[in-house]
Amino acid sequence: MERSYDFVLPQEYEPVTSPIQRLTYPIRNAQVQHWQSVHNCICEQTFDGRYGYLYYYEFWMEHEETIPIYTSMGDLHLTYPLLSDSPLRQSHYTQDFAIEFSKGRGAYLYLAKGEYRLTIPKGRHILVGFILDAGLFRPPANRHFGFLDHLVQAKKNQSPQSDKSVTFRVGDVTKQQLQLLFSKINPNILDNEHMLLKQLIFLIQLSRFKIQDDGKEELIEQARNLLQIMILHQGAQVRLSDIAGVLRKSRDYINEEHKKKYKCTFHDYRNQLLLHHIASTIVGNEKLATTAEECGFSSVIELNKFIKNQTGLTPGSFKQQQENAGNDPLSARGAQEPPS
């Protein structure tokens, strides 16, 4: 995507190739720049993807600094302040618009074309963000993102007025996914853009479960929907404690409430979803090792054990069953669609 912003550092900042500070989260294959003054150090990491432009700024500040920022067009941003001794503040020069970037609170922004100032307080700070393709929020998928409608429309219409969403929590699951994305970027492989898009969609999906909006969706339905998303993304690596952490409820509470409504535990539902995921994956792969990796298992042995425990079949028999069913896991015994 096109980078739509730039900034001008004060004259005392010099570009350096051997900075005195080390990055907390290096991004694989990113474009990296460092600047230093007598008192401060700033690092930029960026990666230009097809569906999103990734940026990362780390600040080591002995003195507060204000940096002018210029945007050449209105764009939709997703931001994650991963570290901050005190909030960073960005404001428009002429509009009544300001946003504070506080540790652990993410936000979506529409930054209109114009001039801004970013005030960076004394201390250590990390700000990560993505410039997003607003086309990701097309109907019907956008029905889950009502809190973004005004920003998506502002982007499409190139509104002259900047705006922001409510903030959302940035917890351990989000941080782990960001670090995973940082480690996997590789423009030299064919499916790099697919990987980036998959990771970005997961982060976007995850953000909506952190926002307490209209309360129309019951907690257990939120838990089931989040589990479905995480199984597709992480497979067997999904921990129910992560679901509980995102929704700020105990694992035992979610398990019991699920059992009351659906007559099976949340853990049972997790296994049903995972088996369904395996059933739809295994027929397309020649090697079980590929299926194990794509479905989040640490080894073929672990995949074999799971299939055997859930169906009584060997992986080979299970795969044959899916192929005989015309690649339709809904009609295969032992891989039935989880109850909705």
Role assignments for model-derived ranges:
Residues 179-192, 201-213, 223-238, 257-258, ...:
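Basic, amphipathic alpha-helical hairpins
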Residues 241-250, 254, 258, 291-298, ...:
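Append "Primarily bacterial transcriptional regulators
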